[in-house]
Amino acid sequence: MTVLPSVDFFPSGNTSVAIEPRLPQADFPEHHHDFHEIVIVEHGTGIHVFNGQPYTITGGTVCFVRDHDRYLYEHTDNLCLTNVLYRSPDRFQFLAGLNQLLPQELDGQYPSHWRVNHSVLQQVRQLVAQMEQQEGENDLPSTASREILFMQLLLLLRKSSLQENLENSASRLNLLLAWLEDHFADEVNWDAVADQFSLSLRTLHRQLKQQTGLTPQRYLNRLRLMKARHLLRHSEASVTDIAYRCGFSDSNHFSTLFRREFNWSPRDIRQGRDGFLQ
């Protein structure tokens, strides 16, 4: 597995925060690194396989990566990221207690992926731009300023994620996307889902297409197919069983959609013919 060392990304041994844009981020094999990072998805789509679990990421996704997490990117489509790197929560010169603001693992579950809406993403970009402007400056005032900006970023992300509620349609769409991630195998009635999240069906279609580039049903099908591909690679379940577990009522229809999406059949994936990135 590829290991990315901090010496390749931080300008000096005293630098506590660094910005690493990926515009765009191509498919990249599984790796980890000896530092922490906050991955901010600007726009585009892709699959983030994080500690073995696949997540569909789109504009507004935020992922908190620890120094022992392993992950890869695949099936990327114009995926643009900004990575905010930091050595460790306890390696700041002027900040203490940051762990209390970061996601915490509970009973083996780590809430690594958050979502923020477009207006928050704009504020995030402004803070990141200010941090970028000060890169290369290692005097104490510049270091303190960068760390203060990092704290502001962390507070903004935490507050915005915790307050992601039904106040506006963008927030409601983010809640809907998070709901789909957990209920992708359910029978989805889009009229009922729109009502559940207080969106008109037209608004749901328009905003989801703007955010993901896909219609709602196309997005759901892709989500199901991604989950199915993961199971084909990492479980012994039959193709038919996987199709049903991922929300498809007809295994033949599943196989047709699968080949159309990936240019490989489910059997090809099971046998490793696609040359899966390791």
From Swiss-Prot:
Q: Where is this site: Interaction with sigma-70?
A: D241, D250
Q: What is its main location?
A: cytoplasm
GO cellular component terms attached to this protein's record? cytoplasm
Q: Which keywords describe this protein according to UniProt?
A: Activator, Cytoplasm, DNA-binding, Repeat, Rhamnose metabolism, Transcription, Transcription regulation
Q: Which InterPro entries match?
A: AraC-bd (IPR003313), AraC_XylS_family_regulators (IPR050204), Homeodomain-like_sf (IPR009057), HTH-like (IPR037923), HTH_AraC (IPR018060), HTH_AraC-typ_CS (IPR018062), RhaR_RhaS-like_N (IPR047220), RmlC-like_jellyroll (IPR014710)
Its name, as the record gives it, is HTH-type transcriptional activator RhaS
Gene Ontology process terms (BP): positive regulation of DNA-templated transcription; rhamnose metabolic process
Q: Which domain of life is it from?
A: Bacteria
Q: Which Pfam families match?
A: AraC_binding, HTH_18
Quaternary assembly:
Binds DNA as a dimer.
List each copy of the HTH araC/xylS-type domain by range: 174-272
Q: Which residues bind DNA?
A: 191-212, 239-262
**MF terms (GO), sorted A to Z:** DNA-binding transcription factor activity; sequence-specific DNA binding
Where does the signal peptide begin and end?
none
| Gene3D superfamilies in the cross-refs | Homeodomain-like (1.10.10.60), Jelly Rolls (2.60.120.10)
Job description of the protein: Activates expression of the rhaBAD and rhaT operons.
What the entry lists under PROSITE patterns is as follows: HTH_ARAC_FAMILY_1, HTH_ARAC_FAMILY_2
Report the subcellular localization: Cytoplasm
